[in-house]
Amino acid sequence: MPERAARLRPDAHAAVSNNKDFNDMKGHAVWASMVPTAVLLAGWSELASAATFDGARLSALWGLPFAGMLLSIAVFPLIAPAFWHHHFGKISAAWALALLGPFALWFGIDLALAKLVHAMLDEYIPFIVLLTALYTVAGGICVRGNLHGTPRLNTAILALGTLLASVMGTTGAAMLLIRPLLRANDNRRHVVHVVVFFIFLVANVGGSLSPLGDPPLFLGFLEGVSFFWTTKHLALPMLFVSGVLLAAFYALDSYYFHQREEERSRFFDPTPDSSFGGIDGKINFVFLAAVVALVLMSGLWRPQIAFDVFGTQVALQNAVRDVALIGVTLLSLASTPRAARAANDFNWAPIQEVAKLFAGIFVTIVPVITMLRAGESGAFAGLVHLVNDSSGHPRDIMYFWATGLLSSFLDNAPTYLVFFNLAGGDAQTLMTTGATTLAAISAGAVFMGANTYIGNAPNFMVKAIAQSRGVPMPSFFAYLGWSGAVLLPLFIVTGWLFF
């Protein structure tokens, strides 16, 4: 017993030390979130020129909370993962308050409340309700059986997931297939590349053909882009990128399997191969069809009825869609056998993280979008000049790369909104005379969300599930090496061919 106690003492000291570091980090984060507020107040005379909330007169300082929010998402999980895990919701709220406080002081509480309600009702709630519905429905579909992870099977699963991603969302398709894929390959030593290409294809590229596929495209749908517009205009770029990636994956997986693992796979298998055992929770396929129908309904049904909520016009079709999606979510939870969700290790942590972080993003992005709508008259005139030529015409290739690179390191949903508005923000114009520009923005946001773990919400969710199953996933920068070697050359060719 004394020896055991002695062994525990260093751990106890370490725990005290770690707790001190944790509290120090918490204090630093609180102070960091106050910096933009202090800067905004310090620049009060400059901000005073924007009392009417005119995008052409707003100072770029109003974009600091948005920048801080996105930098927190990028940096905190790397430098303080434990702190981030416990406090990401508080950090998101702090950045939102860092904007709303000065905003209410200068523009008035009424306008601050109106902008907050608009951000929540017009964009955030529809966005998170759809994601939650897809996540819940997909989490209730359990594929039974342990297949043998050969290159042919793995490629087939990736191809299937790529197609499903535009129907049930990248989140839904990823959550449906990642666990069967990991079980099929748990007898192999080299599995990292399987998960990396799964993120490339299923969690990102595959979601480019419909508003259901990826959050940026759903935001575009909310802005007025028709449901099947992306299906028509992104089909060729998507087929090209996914075809090249599937061929590259098959070649790499064949090398690992036949040269290094074929013998091992015969003798070591934690989950012995078995035939396809059927699907539990089949009722969720009905719910999935209902989700698709509801989104289509909200885009096609125009009753010209709206409700005024603190100045925000909530269209009847959108209210019906969101309430019905909540109903579908509850029905899925009530009717799915518990065993099916248990077999999928279903839990709410991933969607809770997305909900808390995007609440802060949608609040802090309000002044940024207002300034971008001002075009050359606003604070971001330099960005306008980068993506447009001297005569004001868009450089489509620059829209593709600018949207894509920012989507890689920030988040592709708000980045899409930024460049959508930078291109004019009018869906009807962009779908017609500006079709190539809108296609470049859409492809950049969806495709290049695969460049990093933080580019798209499902990326981190897939990484976490793989790590929980014992896969030694690459670090942030190691994953960046994978995407730099595989995706960057492919995107250079894609931009040259299509934009």
Task: Give names to the regions the model predicted.
Residues D21-A50:
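N-terminal secretory/membrane targeting signals
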Residues L47-S49, P81-A82, L100-M120, T132-G149, ...:
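Transmembrane alpha-helix boundary signature
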Residues A51-W62, F83-I91, L113-I125, F227-P237, ...:
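Interfacial loop-to-helix junctions that mark the boundaries of transmembrane helices
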Residues W62-I73, H87-F103, Y124-A133, A159, ...:
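Hydrophobic mid-bilayer segments of alpha-helices in multi-pass membrane transport proteins
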Residues G101-A104, A165, M175-H190, V194-V195, ...:
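Membrane-interfacial helix-loop connectors
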Residues L209-S210, W229-D273, F447-F499:
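Juxtamembrane and boundary regions of transmembrane helices in multi-pass small-molecule transporters
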Residues T230-S335, G495-L497:
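Core mid-bundle transmembrane helix pairs that form the ion/substrate translocation pathway
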Residues L288-V418:
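Transmembrane helical segments that form the transport core of multi-pass membrane transport proteins
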